[in-house]
Amino acid sequence: MKKYLIIFDLDGTVLPRLTVLDDRTVETMKAARAAGHIVCISSARPFAMSKWVYDRMGLDTAISTLNGAHIFHPTDAAFPEYDVSIPRELTKKIFDFCKENDSYPYYAERGDKLWYTDGIHNDYYTLHIEKADPLVEMPEDNDIGTGAARIIVNPATQELCDSLRAMVEATGELSFTEWHYTPSPVNGKSGIRVSIAPLAADKGYAMKHIAEFYGIPLEDCYAFGDLWNDFGMLRDAGHGHALKGSQAERESEAKYVTKYTCAECGVADIIEREILGIEK
C-alpha cells in the first residue's frame, strides 16, 4: 500500500470558525491514520491553540506551528526539532517602532508563549491570550529577552505600514505580509494587520522536513490550505489542494482545488475519494 503524508492548515481549511471542527473531518482523519497514512497539522497557531484538534483527531505525529517557525513532535524525542526566530535586537527594534508610532496592539510569539500589549484584540488573539502558556505583558522597554518566532502588528496608518515594511525588508532576513480587513470597534481601528517572521519559517519547508522524517516523497504528499502562508506547501506537494473559494485558489500554484469549501468539508471529501477510495 502506498503511504501518503496528509498535511493541512487549520483555520479556513478544516476549521470554518475558530473552535468549530466537523465530525466528518475528524472521522476521515482517523480513518486515514487507521489505513496507515501520516496525518499532520501545519498551522499559524501555536501548539496550545492547536492541541484540541490534535487530540480530537487522535494524532501522534509531528506538527508544524507558527507558520513553520516551530516543527516538532510532542511525544517523540527522535524527531529533529526545528525552531527559528527573529533576532532579539530586530524584535525589539520592530516593537520600538510600533510604540513610537502608536501602532497597537502588537504581539510576539515563541512556542506557546505570547507577549502582548493593550489594545483591541480580535477574536483570534482573544482566544490566543486565553490559551497562551505563559502569557506575558509586553515589557516597557520592548525587550522580551529572546527573539520572536512571529510578530503581529496593527499599524496605525498605511504610511506607517509602508515605513515598517521598508525597515523589515531592508534586513534581508525577514518576511513581511500585510493584509486588510474592515475596521470596527471590536477588531481594530486601521484595518491593517501585518505578520513579520524569519524567512526560514515556511510551511513548504515544514512539509519537507516532516516528509523526510517519515520517509515519504513529496509526490506522495497531500497538502491542503487556504491562505498566503500555505502557498509553499501547496506548490511543492504532489497533491497540493487549495480550498475552494479561498485566496489560495486565486493566487497560489496549487495543482488542484477542492470540490467543496472548508465549511463543506472540502478536505475530508478529497481524502475520502482519493486516498480511502470511498465512492461519492
Residues of each region from the PLM?
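Conserved acidic, metal-coordinating active-site core of Asp-based
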Residues: P105, E109-F224, D230
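Active-site phosphate-binding/coordination module
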Residues: D22-H128
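Short active-site oxyanion
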Residues: G36-C40, D60-T61, A149-R150, E219-D220, ...
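Surface-exposed amphipathic alpha-helices with a cationic face
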Residues: V26-A34, K99, E169, K208-E212, ...
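Short, structured coil segments at secondary-structure junctions
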Residues: M57-L59, N67, T171-G172, D236-A237, ...
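Non-catalytic pre-domain segments flanking phosphatase-related domains
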Residues: M1-F8, E27, A34
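Mg2+-dependent phosphoryl-transfer enzymes with acidic/Ser/Thr/Gly-rich catalytic loops
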Residues: M1-L5, D22, R193-K280
